[in-house]
Amino acid sequence: MSSDISEESLLSTALDNFILDNYEAALNQLNSLITKGETSPNKSEYLLYRAVCFLKQGKFENALKDLDEVEKDANYKKEYNYYLTRGKVLYYLCKFEESKKALNTGLELNKDNNLIKDWIKKVENELK
């Protein structure tokens, strides 16, 4: 039980640091969670959070590597935010067709999301 509390506390601190734009501290905490939770059902969630930190830092290849790991997890329910993050990362890596595909999948899951719609327009402008 105490390991759950520890995991919960570490995640809470990581998210607090993320909100405060302290991405290095958030990455350190997420790295600890990922290492400790190698078999945790939450590992993919931690990888997604870490991918967002990498995205914010401009470390797009690292972000894509984490997103690819999440993609392999058949048990992780991928929400629109996964596809939005993947679409952004692929956009910044100039993989526009793949970016559009990810964003369209995200839009299917959240049809009224204006942020995803804006990103799709941005990608389509690059494809012209």
Model-derived segments and spans:
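Alpha-helical tetratricopeptide repeat
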Residues: 1-128
